[in-house]
Amino acid sequence: MVKNTTILFATLLGLTSLRSIATAEDDLVNPFDHDPAAAATGKKLFISAGCMACHGGNARGAVGPDLTDQEWLRPFSQTMVFRTIQNGRSGTLMSPFKGTLTDEQIWQLVKYLLDEGRKRNAAGE
């Protein structure tokens, strides 16, 4: 009985640790969230990194999805968008940009994409 209790305790402790890691991951904050200049830098990166080849001008979609569509973006946190740019998406044409772009540059791209989506939403598009 003591052995079973020890195993149960160790399992619960491990699960609690995993939850803490997941929470920390979910809590990443875009350091450029309130910096309007970062969106302009993000737009330049969008062009220079070749994002337009798949996502079209102004990120409105081509081969890849429309990254300004609020309905499409709704389920994604900024952290998820950041990680998708950083690590790519397996089974898709989305390549990882880790090693090509710095974390700072990826956050600037995230800022640009979210701002474009907000502008589009405000315009009723």
Task: Annotate each predicted stretch with a short phrase.
Residues 1-8:
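Bacterial N-terminal signal peptides that target proteins for export
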Residues 9-17:
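Bacterial N-terminal signal peptides
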Residues 22-47, 123-125:
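Electrostatic cytochrome c docking/interface patches
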Residues 32-43, 56-87, 93, 100:
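Gly/Gly-Pro-rich "capping" loops immediately C-terminal to redox-active cysteine motifs
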Residues 42, 49-57, 94, 109-113:
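The canonical Cys-X-X-Cys-His
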Residues 51-52, 73, 91, 119:
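A general structural signal for well-ordered secondary-structure junctions
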Residues 62-66, 87-125:
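Axial heme c-ligation environment in periplasmic c-type cytochrome domains
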